[in-house]
């Protein structure tokens, strides 16, 4: 449809130009004919249009008739040209109006579509529908969408994250907007000159604003030359009705400056009063001066940093804020938008926030705990050796090892060395009832040198004292009473019986005392052979006679003494006297009874 309109427009332009050229040609021919000298008398046909009422010559009348016909023809041509120009202007105006209406409808549709994306109320949709120009639609759309974005951020909805991630940086967005607007303006100007789609495609494929403007200037310049060459009055009127390109560019720059200024004010939550001042500014310079004054009056901001330690996102970012609380809100929203949930810390000295993402919570039943190798050293009575086990901790390993020891009949004292992860069990000695114990014993020997009993015997005892008691009981039981000696080296006791001789009295046998303690069975003494005993006694007596005589002589000269230094003879005599007195007393008592 668009292409068909352009073709019709081009045909109308061509027809208009052709008519103009024809009219000019006719006028020129007429002027040439009038100015040329008349050499031949023209022949006036019968029935000529002019008569000779004024007495003019026939030649003059013929010329005047020809001039009249030429004038009529010229007037008709001019009338046709004017009518064609008027029709062409009306068609061009209608086409321009239709194109503007289409552009306005498209802009409204785009704005309403974006409003629906942000859930904008019907109030703002009605404002869009009532807008009269594309520029008005776009300005209102930019303001409403920006406010909607802020509202969505404050609500912290889940859909905000996806939307923000899909947005391009502000600088790129501005460049993209400028490039798109430059292309629209360029195509609009190319449409004015009926430029072909080939050149429009070149405009649409340009990557920079500068490229668009350069291409636009070249194409428009060529189109202007072509249109001027057509020399149509309608074209001149049309061109005069257009807004100068310089004013159009200034208007675009002013609109862009206002949009950017309002965005900057939105960052700081500036009221609508200052935004209205921006929107009412008439020049770009006025907008910039006003935004500088407003920002200078705002509270001073600081740069805050955020360090992200996430599972999948790590890095740093910064923001400008009037205080730490404001920066924290911005950073937490940023972290939430990027799926980072963790522990927050803040260092006021460096104005740095740090968020460390929490580790993923895993079901304990799904965990495979780390294990350690533990060793058991067994020092048992019948089982000795080492074994190992894998366990998550020492307590678990201890239970396993104690069960193992119990299963193998090992019961002892437990120790643990954490440095080497080693348990040691040393088995306890067997507990035996004291009544069942058989103490270690030693063999002791007794040598008896008695008057009637001579020989040796032995006994087993736990110590010398016990053996001495047993030997003395044995000697007493056998009527041996003498001097006792003990050699620890040979574990030998010796008892030498004392000899008591009282003149005039028959020797009396001492009374045996009754045993007061249980007797320990002893090995009977080995009696000495009689012949050998007699020989030994004879030899001893012969050897003792000279010595006895000498001793008797000395004893006669000295008095007997007491104690260990006294002569055994006197000791024995005293004992005999005492025994005799005791026996006599007993006999007397019996007689009295």
UniProtKB/Swiss-Prot annotation:
Protein name in the entry:
Immunoglobulin G-binding protein G
Cellular location(s):
Secreted, Cell wall
Basic and acidic residues bias locations = 529-557
| Membrane topology annotation | Peptidoglycan-anchor
Q: Name one GO cellular component term.
A: extracellular region
Which InterPro entries does the record cross-reference, listed alphabetically?
GA-like (IPR035152), Ig/albumin-bd_sf (IPR009063), IgG-bd_B (IPR000724), LPXTG_anchor (IPR019931), M_anchor (IPR019950), YSIRK_signal_dom (IPR005877)
Motif interval(s): LPXTG sorting signal: 559-563
Q: Which organism is it from?
A: Streptococcus sp. group G
């Amino acid at each position: 449809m668009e292409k068909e309109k352009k073709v019709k427009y081009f045909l109308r332009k061509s027809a208009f130009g052709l008519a103009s050229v024809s009219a000019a040609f006719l006028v020129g021919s007429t002027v040439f004919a009038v100015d040329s000298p008349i050499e031949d008398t023209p022949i006036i046909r019968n029935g000529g249009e002019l008569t000779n009422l004024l007495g003019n010559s026939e030649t003059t009348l013929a010329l005047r008739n020809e001039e009249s016909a030429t004038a009529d023809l010229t007037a008709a041509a001019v009338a046709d040209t004017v009518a064609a120009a008027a029709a062409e202007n009306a068609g061009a105006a209608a086409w321009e109006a239709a194109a503007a209406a289409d552009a306005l409808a498209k802009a409204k549709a785009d704005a309403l579509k974006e409003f629906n994306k942000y859930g904008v109320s019907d109030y703002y949709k009605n404002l869009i529908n009532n807008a009269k120009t594309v520029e008005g639609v776009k300005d209102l759309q930019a303001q409403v969408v920006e406010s909607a974005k802020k509202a969505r951020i404050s609500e912290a909805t889940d859909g905000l994250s996806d939307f923000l991630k899909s947005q391009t940086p502000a600088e790129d967005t501005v460049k993209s907007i400028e490039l798109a607007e430059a292309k629209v303006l360029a195509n609009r100007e190319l449409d004015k000159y009926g430029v072909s789609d080939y050149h429009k495609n070149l405009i649409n494929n340009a990557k920079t604003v500068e490229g668009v403007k350069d291409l636009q200037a070249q194409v428009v310049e060529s189109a202007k030359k072509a249109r001027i060459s057509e020399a149509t009055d309608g074209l001149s009127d049309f061109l005069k009705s257009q807004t100068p390109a310089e004013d159009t560019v200034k208007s675009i720059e002013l609109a862009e400056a206002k949009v950017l200024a309002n965005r900057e004010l939105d960052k700081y939550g500036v009221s609508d009063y200052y935004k209205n001042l921006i929107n009412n500014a008439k020049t770009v310079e006025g907008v910039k001066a006003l935004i500088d004054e407003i920002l200078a009056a705002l509270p001073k901001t600081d740069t805050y940093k955020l360090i992200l330690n996430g599972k999948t996102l790590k890095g740093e970012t910064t923001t400008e804020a009037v205080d730490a609380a404001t920066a924290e809100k911005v950073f937490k929203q940023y972290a939430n938008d990027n799926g980072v949930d963790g522990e927050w810390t803040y260092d006021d000295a460096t104005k740095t926030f740090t968020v460390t993402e929490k580790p993923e919570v895993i079901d304990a039943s799904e965990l495979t705990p780390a294990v350690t190798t533990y060793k058991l050293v067994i020092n048992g009575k019948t089982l000795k050796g080492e074994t190992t086990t894998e366990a998550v901790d020492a307590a678990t390993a201890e239970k396993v090892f104690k069960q193992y020891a119990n299963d193998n009949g090992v019961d002892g004292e437990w120790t643990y060395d954490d440095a080497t992860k080693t348990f040691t069990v040393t088995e306890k000695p067997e507990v035996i009832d004291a009544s069942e114990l058989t103490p270690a014993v030693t063999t002791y020997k007794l040598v008896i040198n008695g008057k009637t009993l001579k020989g040796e015997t032995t006994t087993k005892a736990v110590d010398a004292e016990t053996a001495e008691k047993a030997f003395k009981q044995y000697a007493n039981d056998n009527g041996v009473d003498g001097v006792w000696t003990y050699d620890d080296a040979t574990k030998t006791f010796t008892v030498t019986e004392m000899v008591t001789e009282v003149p005039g009295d028959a020797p009396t046998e001492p009374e045996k005392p009754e045993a007061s303690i249980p007797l320990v069975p002893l090995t009977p003494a080995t009696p000495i052979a009689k012949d050998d005993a007699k020989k030994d006694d004879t030899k001893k007596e012969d050897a003792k006679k000279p010595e006895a005589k000498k001793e008797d002589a000395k004893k006669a000269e000295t008095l007997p003494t007491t104690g260990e230094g006294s002569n055994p003879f006197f000791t024995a005599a005293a004992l005999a006297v005492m025994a005799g007195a005791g026996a006599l007393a007993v006999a007397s008592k019996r007689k009295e009874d």
